């Protein structure tokens, strides 16, 4: 089955079609998904009737508003039901694998709490703003000590980024980068190049992609930057922690974790 890591909406040219595809896959039992912060943003705008937001958010709202009235009402109702029913994170393969949009700490795994939900969907920031006007993110992955392999996204990187037993597979597809999936339990990364740049961000990823790896910092170390260098999908990072040894789960069907 496919497992979607969130941020299915915003900035892309066919948000409604993409959302319908994922909702159908999940309802038919062919996929699982966790919510991203962009799903929450769009849902909030639809509920409040807001006409203000980022350029990417309003692009999505316009696509939804362009639907015929009956189709628009049906889509909004289905989207609301879908997003609100999603778990903030997934624990799979008897605890060997975890999936969360922005990551997860060991103490939140398998537990339902407001703090854990907020972390899984939005991550954690230092409270500081970088020179691009974006929040400086806490590098939670560097301190992760859990047994489960955590697959996440949220912060675009130039290439899949392994840090200990975590891997970030958000490789900036919407910014002209790649759409990346991790085949599990094979531990094989598969990437497909974006057809074009769909959205222009404020800064660029390594290798000339539209968005650079977001500035991150450990608590008390503001400004620490962790950036992945461009490399072949599945290659061992050229700097930073080595790729971890693949977990050896009980035999099961293949799971693909993907994100746009």
Feature locations, PLM:
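An N-terminal domain-cap segment
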Residues: 1-14
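Residue-level marker for buried hydrophobic side chains located in beta-strands
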Residues: 2-4, 33-34, 98, 151, ...
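Short, glycine/acidic-enriched loop or turn micro-motifs at the edges of active sites
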Residues: 10, 39-40, 104, 157, ...
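Active-site neighborhood of divalent metal-dependent phosphoester bond hydrolases
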Residues: 11-91, 119-121, 125-132
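Short aromatic-enriched loop/helix-cap "lid" or pocket-rim segments at secondary-structure transitions
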Residues: 44-48, 109-113, 204
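Hydrophobic, aromatic-enriched interface-forming segments
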Residues: 79-111
């Amino acid at each position: 089955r496919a497992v979607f890591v969130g941020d299915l909406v915003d900035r892309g040219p066919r948000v409604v079609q993409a959302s319908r595809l994922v909702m159908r896959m999940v309802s038919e039992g062919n996929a699982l998904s966790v919510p991203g912060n962009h799903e929450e943003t769009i849902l909030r705008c639809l509920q409040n009737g807001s006409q203000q937001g980022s350029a990417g958010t309003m692009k999505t709202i316009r696509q939804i508003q362009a639907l015929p009235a009956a189709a628009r009402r049906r889509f909004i109702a289905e989207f609301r039901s879908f997003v609100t029913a999603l778990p903030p994170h997934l624990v799979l393969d008897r605890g060997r694998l975890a999936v969360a949009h922005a990551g997860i700490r060991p103490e939140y795994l398998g537990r339902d709490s407001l703090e854990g939900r907020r972390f899984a969907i939005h991550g954690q920031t230092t409270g500081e703003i970088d020179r691009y006007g974006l929040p400086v993110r806490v590098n939670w992955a560097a301190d992760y000590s859990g047994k489960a392999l955590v697959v996440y996204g949220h912060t675009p990187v130039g290439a899949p980024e392994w840090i200990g037993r975590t891997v970030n597979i958000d490789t900036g597809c919407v910014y002209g980068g790649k759409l990346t999936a991790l085949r599990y339990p094979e531990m094989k990364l598969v990437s497909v190049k974006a057809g074009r740049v769909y959205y222009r961000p404020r800064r660029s990823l390594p290798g000339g992609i539209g968005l650079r790896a977001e500035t991150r910092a450990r608590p008390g170390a503001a400004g620490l930057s962790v950036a992945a260098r461009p490399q072949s999908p599945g290659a061992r990072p050229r700097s930073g922690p080595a790729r971890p040894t693949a977990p050896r789960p009980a035999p099961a069907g293949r799971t693909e974790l993907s994100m746009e």
